From Swiss-Prot:
Organism lineage: Bacteria, Pseudomonadati, Pseudomonadota, Gammaproteobacteria, Enterobacterales
Role: Catalyzes the reversible cleavage of L-rhamnulose-1-phosphate to dihydroxyacetone phosphate (DHAP) and L-lactaldehyde.
Group of enzyme by EC: lyase
Cofactor note: Binds 1 zinc ion per subunit.
Keyword Nucleotide-binding tagged: no
Domain of life, per lineage: Bacteria
Pathway the protein contributes to: Carbohydrate degradation; L-rhamnose degradation; glycerone phosphate from L-rhamnose: step 3/3
Keywords, alphabetical: Cytoplasm, Lyase, Metal-binding, Rhamnose metabolism, Zinc
Subunit structure comment from the entry: Homotetramer.
Organism listed in the record: Yersinia pestis
Cofactor field: Zn(2+)
Name of the coding gene: rhaD
Entry protein name: Rhamnulose-1-phosphate aldolase
One CC-aspect GO term: cytosol
EC number: 4.1.2.19
């Protein structure tokens, strides 16, 4: 067995994709994850790399990510199959030193490419690296059922949607005080939706793609998963509340402010006033 299969990052990706599939967020080949790795984390596994790595040109240059390593889910791959055959469904790649291409060093044993949303991932990685001082290393996308459902019946506006989720569960303001960003519906797998997502990622660690899914970012796979899981739980609660006739009482603005003070977080101001 290849040593890389027992690495923390392959095992972590197996767990994340399995958990997300069991949640019902990643049907068929839905969803994608990218994890930025440090050179010293990858170095011990070089003996498992391809002797002649395949080079692929990027659709959009990413000089900010030059020489960076990423573990990414493959395009058209099913999350439910990652744990069965990680080498076929994942890919370890390194961006070229000019940021114009990447080389596939491991994975995709049956051929193929990284996720079709790679441009969106890379653009979001660049922004989240900047705003987090390099601590954010994960971009995660999935089709979270209740968040998608709410996008059909709620105003697609950052502040009001954030306020709805904050009121759905007390923990939400603490977990994502920066709120949720929303982009217009766009064709997936394009540079355009990647640009729009990255713009929202500058202010928000969660970005909703209406009628499609959610993007989340964080320092670790657990953090990104937990962020989405928390927002999705609140969305599920709100879907049930709406189905029962709507709210008769809720968490007030004053209570949200008190909550933020207790946990020393700075809440999105516009959402407090929504």
């Amino acid at each position: 067995m290849q040593a890389i299969l027992s690495s923390w990052f392959i095992q972590g990706m197996i767990k994340a994709t399995s958990d997300m599939w069991h949640k019902g967020w990643d049907e068929r080949n839905g969803g994608n994850i990218s994890l930025r790795l440090l050179a010293e984390e990858v170095e011990p596994y070089r003996r498992d790399f391809y002797q002649q790595p395949r080079k692929v040109e990027l659709t959009q240059p990413a000089p900010e990510l030059a020489n960076s390593w990423f573990l990414v889910t493959g395009s058209g791959k099913f999350f439910r199959n990652v744990e069965l055959n990680p080498a076929e469904n994942l890919v370890l790649l390194q961006v070229s030193n000019d940021g114009m291409a990447y080389h596939i060093h491991w994975g995709l044993t049956q051929g193929g490419l990284p996720t079709s949303e790679l441009a969106a991932h890379f653009q979001s990685h660049i922004v989240r690296m900047q705003v987090s001082g390099g601590t954010n290393r994960v971009i995660m996308h999935c089709h979270a059922t209740n968040l998608i459902a709410l996008s059909y019946v709620q105003k697609l506006e950052n502040a009001s949607f954030t306020r709805l989720l904050w009121e759905g569960s007390t923990e939400c303001l603490v977990v994502f005080p920066d709120g949720i960003g929303i982009v217009p519906w766009m064709v997936p797998g394009t540079d355009g939706i990647g640009t729009q997502t990255a713009e929202q990622m500058r202010e928000h660690s969660l970005v909703l793609w209406p009628f499609h899914g959610i993007f989340g970012s964080g320092p670790t796979l657990d953090d990104a998963f937990g962020l989405i899981d928390t927002a999705e739980k609140s969305a599920e609660i709100m879907v049930k509340v709406l189905s029962m006739g709507g709210k008769k009482q809720t968490i007030s603005r004053e209570q949200l402010i008190a909550l933020a003070a207790r946990f020393d977080v700075t809440p999105m101001a516009a959402a407090l006033d929504a």
